Amino acid sequence: MAEANGKITQVIGAVVDVQFDGQLPAILNALETENNGKRLVLEVAQHLGENTVRTIAMDATEGLVRGLPVKDTGGPIMVPVGDATLGRILNVVGEPVDEGGPVEATQTRAIHQQAPDFAAQATASEILVTGIKVIDLLAPYSKGGKIGLFGGAGVGKTVLIMELINNIAKVHSGYSVFAGVGERTREGNDLYHEMVESGVIKPDDLSKSQVALVYGQMNEPPGARMRVALTGLTVAEQFRDATGTDVLFFVDNIFRFTQAGSEVSALLGRIPSAVGYQPTLATDMGAMQERITSTKNGSITSIQAVYVPADDLTDPAPATTFAHLDATTVLSRAISELGIYPAVDPLDSNSRILDPAVVGEEHYQVARDVQGILQKYKSLQDIIAILGMDELSEEDKLTVARARKIQRFLSQPFDVAKVFTGSDGVQVPLEDTIKSFKAVVAGEYDHLPEAAFYMVGGIEDVKAKAQRLAADAA
């Protein structure tokens, strides 16, 4: 087919109208034009009539003028995939942004793909150990599952996702892909340098790197922020299909994907739905989330940070995301205000695989006992606030004392938060976590002070800290 050429007729911010003489390009096709000597990619969003298409720009449109020639590439945005992307930072259209020269890829892949059909999907459940006590015990992650980290502004989503990258990606033998969607450029820069330091990215020999980075940060136009998650996912899908291994796919932040979709929707003149979001919110989210799945070839384990506007979990953006996830880790401002980090809410967080058939009877029972004590403490808090601790029965006083110890024991120092805490991070094996909490619930450590349980690893660390505290007091 002869390639179609058109010209720009109108530019409104990130929306560009292009008129063609002959064949109109299909919806989602990529068009190319030149802006100030740089390639600018436009994605077709609507057919308007009079041989005109309305497109969304994937980069800044300053400098475009009416009459500029545009050519149709004949297909969707194609990005480089495979080993050539390892150790590199790409943008939404697959161009390198790390000053490391062109990406020498032998393969490219369209960013819009169909989700695997039912017959191709795999359903095995196996726990993915993170080394973080509160997660492994109460809301365990599954290999090949979708995991969401929900939280408002400043409660520690990015720190938690960085720690998960630190704990899982560094010891993970396969590949990882990190998609930075509408977040701070500084954080993306820090992550790259951290990965170089830890040897996950090897700048001297990129072929030995284990991670590919795809960034579309806060300063990008909405078109780029809306599509960059798909670019990252496309790179991850190729690793899954080609290597047959478990690929880790980190997204920070999935809310920005929805937010960018809402901006684009308004620019295209669609009537907004609830709270000003796009009417296609569930469709957009579903089209992306259904592609993140495990097939008979390999699996993608995705960990997604989800910003919660105004700490309201019923907001349409986080509420739509909930439906797609296997495990949800909810970060709570009330817990972060107590100084307990990670500020995971042990009663709000849950997981599909917290089931005796998957994690075993002992793990399941300990997790439920811990939640039971914390739930009882929560229901007693009103009485304590009004009447004080003295009015409680002896049994309730014991429950409160244990709950406060458990609450503090769920905190843990992180490697990536060393600058804040001044102490080295700790990773706790799952067996230790279960054994430690089982003993605390049973009352074996009722004699130790609350402070000994704060910011430590396993129960041995608690005993050592209690001895130190006793020595200091003496």
Curated annotation (Swiss-Prot):
Swiss-Prot/TrEMBL catalytic activity: ATP + H2O + 4 H(+)(in) = ADP + phosphate + 5 H(+)(out)
Q: What is its main location?
A: membrane
The role this protein plays is: Produces ATP from ADP in the presence of a proton gradient across the membrane. The catalytic sites are hosted primarily by the beta subunits.
What family does the entry list?
Belongs to the ATPase alpha/beta chains family.
- Name the gene: atpD
Q: Which PANTHER family match?
A: ATP SYNTHASE (PTHR15184), ATP SYNTHASE SUBUNIT BETA, MITOCHONDRIAL (PTHR15184:SF71)
- For the keyword Secreted, the answer is no
Q: Which organism is it from?
A: Paracoccus denitrificans (strain Pd 1222)
Q: Which CDD domains is this protein grouped with?
A: ATP-synt_F1_beta_C, ATP-synt_F1_beta_N, F1-ATPase_beta_CD
* Catalytic EC class: translocase
Q: Name one GO cellular component term.
A: plasma membrane
Recorded hits in PROSITE patterns, A to Z, give:
ATPASE_ALPHA_BETA (PS00152)
Protein name as catalogued: ATP synthase subunit beta
Which Pfam families has this protein been placed in? ATP-synt_ab (PF00006), ATP-synt_ab_N (PF02874), ATP-synt_VA_C (PF22919)
**Binding residue positions for ATP:** G151, G152, A153, G154, V155, G156, K157, T158
Question: Keywords in UniProt for this one?
Answer: ATP synthesis, ATP-binding, Cell inner membrane, Cell membrane, CF(1), Hydrogen ion transport, Ion transport, Membrane, Nucleotide-binding, Translocase, Transport
Any idea which GO molecular function terms this record carries?
ATP binding; ATP hydrolysis activity; proton-transporting ATP synthase activity, rotational mechanism
**Subunit and partners:** F-type ATPases have 2 components, CF(1) - the catalytic core - and CF(0) - the membrane proton channel. CF(1) has five subunits: alpha(3), beta(3), gamma(1), delta(1), epsilon(1). CF(0) has three main subunits: a(1), b(2) and c(9-12). The alpha and beta chains form an alternating ring which encloses part of the gamma chain. CF(1) is attached to CF(0) by a central stalk formed by the gamma and epsilon chains, while a peripheral stalk is formed by the delta and b chains.
